Structure formats: C-alpha cells, structure tokens
C-alpha cells in the first residue's frame, strides 16, 4: 500500500513542482506556454476574422454606392433629353449634367441629422 502512495506522489511530483521556500504549487512552464500561445492564436483568429468581415463590408458598401450612382445616372439621363438641353441653352442656363443629378439624388436620399429636430 505504501508503494501505491509513493507511486501517486511521484507522479504528482513529476507534473507539478513545489517551491520549498514558498510552499506554493507551480505549473510546469511548458503548460503555461501552451495556454498563452493558445490564447494568442484565438485572438489572432478573431482579429483576422474581424478584419476580413470589415473588408467585405467595405467592398459591399462600395458596390452598392456604385450601383446606386449608376441607377441614378440612368434615371437622370432619361429625364434629361436633348429638348431639355436646348431649352436650357435658349434660356442662357448651363445644361444639367448627369453628375449633378446623381449628387443631388444621393444627398436627397441620405438620412437627415436628428440634431436639427
């Protein structure tokens, strides 16, 4: 029976060492290193995932804005016929450009600030 106790004690001593001056239990350094490395890997993966999602969101927003601009440009050019341009020139005004129509459309569609309410 004492052999079994010695066996248990020796296996415990192999896995964990005690500092005789403090009498505290210390974990082997390799275990601590693995835990710290695992935490770094998880943080790195999380950071990488967030960066990927932000990049995807940015590209998607650019694509949407491009499509909205094209749609607004197409709608504006349909309304802005050659007869309209002739009338504007006859009235000594500058002809409408599709860019100004797109810009006006985009700003009209933007949500208004709540500070003014």
From Swiss-Prot:
Which stretches of sequence are listed as region Disordered? 1-30, 71-117
User: A single GO molecular function, which one?
Assistant: structural constituent of chromatin
A single Gene Ontology CC annotation of this entry is:
nucleus
Q: Which GO terms describe its biological process?
A: heterochromatin formation
- Biased composition of type Polar residues is found at 72-81
Q: Assembly and partners?
A: May interact with the N-terminus of HD.
Q: Which residues cross the membrane?
A: none
Basic and acidic residues compositional bias, start-end: 82-117
Protein name as it appears in the record = Huntingtin-interacting protein M
List the source organism.
Homo sapiens
């Amino acid at each position: 029976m004492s052999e079994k106790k010695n066996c248990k004690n020796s296996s415990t001593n192999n896995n964990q060492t005690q500092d005789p001056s403090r009498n505290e239990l210390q974990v082997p350094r390799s275990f601590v290193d693995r835990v710290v490395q695992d935490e770094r890997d998880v943080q790195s993966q999380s950071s990488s995932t967030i960066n990927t999602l932000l990049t995807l969101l940015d590209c998607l927003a650019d694509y949407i804005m491009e499509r909205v601009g094209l749609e607004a440009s197409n709608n504006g050019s349909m309304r802005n016929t050659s007869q309209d341009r002739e009338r504007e020139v006859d009235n000594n005004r500058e002809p409408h450009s599709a860019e100004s129509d797109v810009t006006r459309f985009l700003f009209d569609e933007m949500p208004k600030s709540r500070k003014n309410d």
